[in-house]
A protein has these predicted regions:
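C-terminal motif of bacterial Sec signal peptides marking the signal peptidase cleavage site
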Residues: 18-22
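Bacterial signal peptide processing site
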Residues: 24-26
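Bacterial N-terminal signal peptides that target proteins for export
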Residues: 1-10
Length: 256
């Protein structure tokens, strides 16, 4: 059935919208992943963004800098692709993340509060394969990026979303609801090497949970098990999953 074909693609888009899994439904031709640069990465000599001006949106583990672009290389099922992340409309209490995939552009509004950063809605997307995607956030729980003082080994926090969704495939309009819950744990501080360079202290966050979707009578529960590495004053440098349902790796290539 058509809905069965659309569902796996849509599930991946939801994960990408949360910035936790990056799989473009129409990726670039198969090519080997970028070879990591063995040279040490340049470490910031001073804070690259203004703490006073950013207010509650200041967080060195997810630095918000307008005019900068984080470029990532992605590999999913041996297929390579790219992602560029930038920020706009930055205020002391909110900002917008712009994610540019080869065939998808998303914009996600975030809010900042005393507990950390939270994307208060799913992305408004421009998708060639699935036009007119509409998300309505029904409920949000927890934060995605906790405050700086919480970044210690052993710290755990939960994130959850309940959403309604509507999109078009061909001449068919699909409607459904999703429930996504994950538990995040800072498990270690360890060295890591990615295409952008080598970092001696990367905070490894292990994430586990489930995404339950019901679209036009088709129901599915997708287990989410992946790991993200953050470097202070750089942000996310790697995000990866070995789960056969959503298998991918995303690594920072440059920050320009």
């Amino acid at each position: 059935m058509k809905s069965i074909k659309v569902f796996p693609i849509f599930a991946l888009l939801l994960v990408a919208a949360l910035s936790i899994a990056a799989c473009s439904p129409k990726a670039a031709p198969d090519q080997p992943a970028s070879t990591p640069n063995e040279q040490p990465a340049e470490q910031p000599t001073e804070n690259p963004f203004n703490q006073t001006a950013l207010g509650e949106c200041y967080n060195p583990f997810n630095p918000i800098m307008e005019g900068k672009v984080w470029k990532y290389a992605m590999v999913s099922n041996k297929v390579s692709s790219t992602l560029e992340v930038s920020y706009k409309d930055v205020t002391p209490s909110s900002f917008t993340t712009v994610q540019q995939f080869p065939d998808i552009r998303t914009e996600v509004q975030w809010t900042c509060g005393p507990d950390g950063m939270l994307s208060s809605q799913f992305a408004s997307m421009s998708i060639a394969q699935i036009p007119d995607v509409q998300f309505e956030t029904m409920e949000v729980k927890g934060v995605l990026i906790p405050k700086e003082d919480k970044w210690q080994v052993g710290y755990t926090w939960d994130t959850g979303y309940v959403i309604k969704v509507k999109f078009t495939s061909g001449e068919t309009v699909f409607e459904g609801q999703g429930n996504m819950t994950v538990t995040n744990t800072i498990s270690a501080i360890e060295p890591i090497t990615v295409p952008s360079g080598s970092y001696s202290e990367a905070f490894r966050v292990d994430i586990a949970g489930n995404m339950m979707m019901s679209i036009m009578g088709t129901e599915s529960t997708i287990p989410l098990t992946y790991t993200t590495w953050y470097v202070k004053d750089v942000g996310m440098v790697k995000n990866a999953s070995a789960d056969p349902t959503i298998s991918y790796s995303m690594e920072l290539v440059s920050l320009e």
